[in-house]
Amino acid sequence: MPNHSPRFISNLTRETYALILAGGRGSRLFELTDWRAKPALYFGGKFRVIDFPLSNCVNSGIRRIGVVTQYQSHSLIRHVMRGWGHFKRELGESVEILPASQRYSESWYQGTADAVFQNIDIIRHELPRYVMILSGDHVYRMDYAGMLAAHAQSGADMTVCCQEVPVAEAAGSFGVMEVAEDMRVVGFEEKPANPSCLPHDPERCLASMGNYVFNTEFLFDQLRKDAENVSSERDFGKDIIPSIIREHKVFAYAFKSGLGAGQDYWRDVGTLDTFWQANMELLSPEPHLNLYDAKWPIWTYQEQLPPAKFVFDDEDRRGMATDSIVSGGCIISGAKVKRSVLFNEVRICSYSEVEGAVILPDVVVLRNCRLKNVIIDRGCVIPEGMVIGHNHDHDRARGFRVTDKGVVLITREMLGLPVGFE
């Protein structure tokens, strides 16, 4: 019978070290990740993607955490230092940043497995019984204690968190596994072009979420073997998991948030369309991802900013926002904002109309602009009278990126402004 006693769970989380892999580029986000890693991507009006796995760790009772960084890491490191520096080492708590440092070779991190291997000495110093390896570039809420309990009680060497996804969505994007009735993994293929479907549903498959639990010494042994294999790509999905499923106990854990009915939310915001859509979903009256749940808060760096302000109330010049998230420091000055997410210190000037927009911090939209279904990168200044999102041929001609679903990306470079905002 499963043991879910508070003492059992608290012992598990205390004996666990979490390693968040946060070095990914996010190439399918194109210019949006030219100056930041995917885990440093802004989300939901005030957060960054990395805040979600970090908050899940803290809320689950896991207080020893390493954040592995590599690509364009400055903004990510700065955010973690500012927002997550409150842990007390004397109480056994820590959030450590682990940049690529050529610890065991002259190469930078060569893959997900190599990123962990090069930090073995740091993990060993923590003396954990279990190591939880987490993807740093997904938006979700999850109580990791449930997965830890399932791992311990199954006697597994490794546990892989998974969920059912459409075959078309998984193709080329996710690791796909086959499992026996007891959830033991019997087959695994990394990002196949033609994923194996579920026996009971030809339209869906079982996809890895990139979250793993290992027994510590077992993990170290497998990483050493992988490091000695000259043909390995140093990747958990491509190399480690396929090599161990036959001779070792690898189990799948079906993703569930552990936060109650209807709370199982997980999104890969790895494309411009999915990033835009995930932000738009937050605007419904009862969004599937509840950022207002005080029982499972999402922590982040809190800037000291004045409240949002809406000014002018004339018939043709009324500052207003409907069905929107408007963050601190924003000023809506005689403009109309509808179904949009505005991050900190955005200013929308008079007579402009904004709809379906995700606007990152420090953006200024000057007068008489009409913007629809756009993502505006940090620090942009939209010139007066500009119309974007209403004619995609014109948008492309001006150098903006238009997605297959009609979302328009605007960056400082596209506007001819100096680069470098993170």
Curated annotation (Swiss-Prot):
InterPro entries: ADP-Glc_PPase, ADP_Glu_pyroP_CS, GlgC_bac, GlmU/GlgC-like_hexapep, NTP_transferase_dom, Nucleotide-diphossugar_trans, Trimer_LpxA-like_sf. Its EC number is 2.7.7.27. It comes from the Bacteria. The keyword Transferase applies. Disulfide bonds: none annotated. GO terms for biological process: glycogen biosynthetic process. SUPFAM superfamilies: Nucleotide-diphospho-sugar transferases, Trimeric LpxA-like enzymes. Alpha-D-glucose 1-phosphate binds at Y109, G175, E190, K191, S208. Pfam families: Hexapep_GlmU (PF24894), NTP_transferase (PF00483). Keywords: ATP-binding, Carbohydrate metabolism, Glycogen biosynthesis, Glycogen metabolism, Nucleotide-binding, Nucleotidyltransferase, Transferase. It catalyses: alpha-D-glucose 1-phosphate + ATP + H(+) = ADP-alpha-D-glucose + diphosphate. GO terms for molecular function: ATP binding; glucose-1-phosphate adenylyltransferase activity. Pathway: Glycan biosynthesis; glycogen biosynthesis. HAMAP family: GlgC. Involved in the biosynthesis of ADP-glucose, a building block required for the elongation reactions to produce glycogen. Catalyzes the reaction between ATP and alpha-D-glucose 1-phosphate (G1P) to produce pyrophosphate and ADP-Glc. Belongs to the bacterial/plant glucose-1-phosphate adenylyltransferase family. Homotetramer. This is Glucose-1-phosphate adenylyltransferase. It comes from Shewanella amazonensis (strain ATCC BAA-1098 / SB2B).
